[in-house]
């Protein structure tokens, strides 16, 4: 994917909530969103993240709007929890060519325990071997287990694209280097939504842009721009 060009960061609220990350999953080739978000929100998501509107797929997962919590993926594949037969068919029909994997694990909150870009995946320690194999096979990347800043729900504490990454503000220099080595992109530490440490809860990004919660401050946005845009300002 492109490592050059502009990188847009724009504020968004969904259902009056700045925690937009719990509702959305994004890669360079698609976005998953709740089935009842408005047309204006779909248009904003499409424009900022550079994804065609027909590839902003609206659905519920296990009957819930929390798409960003329950799913994750990269440009090659999407990971869904068990018990989602209808959703699997919907995604496969909408996103031809994208792999869909059902992860056999005790945790339905895949977005909290798995974080990935198109080069690698970091999973919370303790995920079952069969689950890790499904993740690797579906996404086409190596899976590494680890935690960041004492946080085992790594998917809530990290946002990474193919250009850069933003991690929990308590991540050490050694941890930031570890993340950079795993994902093959530079990493920064930061916050969203006026000091929230779990950056994924209010931040959704790909190589082309980022959407942040409405409470995110100017300095936080500047940090996100540099971290996820690969230094583009």
From Swiss-Prot:
UniProt record, GO biological process: cytosolic ribosome assembly
Superkingdom classification of source: Archaea
UniProt keywords, alphabetically: Initiation factor, Protein biosynthesis
Family matches, as SMART domains: eIF6
InterPro entries the record matches: eIF6
GO molecular function: ribosome binding; translation initiation factor activity
Any Pfam family matching the protein: eIF-6
Chain's role: Binds to the 50S ribosomal subunit and prevents its association with the 30S ribosomal subunit to form the 70S initiation complex.
Similarity field: Belongs to the eIF-6 family.
HAMAP family in alphabetical order: eIF_6
Protein name: Translation initiation factor 6
Gene name as annotated: eif6
């Amino acid at each position: 994917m492109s490592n050059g060009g502009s990188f847009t960061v724009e504020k968004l609220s969904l259902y009056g909530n700045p925690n937009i990350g719990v509702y959305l999953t994004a890669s360079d080739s698609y976005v998953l969103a709740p089935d009842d978000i408005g047309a204006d929100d779909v248009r904003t998501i499409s424009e900022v993240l550079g994804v065609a509107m027909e590839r902003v797929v609206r659905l519920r997962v296990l009957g819930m709007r929390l798409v960003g919590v329950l799913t994750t993926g990269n440009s090659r594949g999407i990971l869904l929890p068990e018990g989602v037969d209808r959703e699997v068919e919907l995604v496969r029909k909408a996103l031809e060519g994208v792999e869909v994997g059902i992860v056999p694990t005790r945790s339905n909150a895949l977005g909290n325990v798995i974080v990935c870009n198109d080069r690698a995946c970091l999973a919370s320690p303790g995920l079952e071997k069969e689950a890790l194999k499904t993740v690797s096979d579906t996404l086409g990347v190596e899976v590494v287990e680890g935690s960041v800043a004492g946080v085992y729900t790594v998917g809530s504490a990290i946002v990474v694209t193919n250009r850069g990454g933003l991690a929990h503000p308590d991540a050490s220099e050694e941890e930031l280097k570890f993340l950079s080595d795993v994902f093959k992109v530079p990493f920064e530490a930061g916050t969203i939504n006026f000091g929230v440490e779990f950056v994924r809860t209010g931040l959704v990004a790909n190589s082309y842009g980022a959407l942040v919660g409405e409470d995110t401050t100017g300095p936080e946005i500047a940090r996100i721009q540099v971290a996820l845009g690969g230094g583009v300002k």
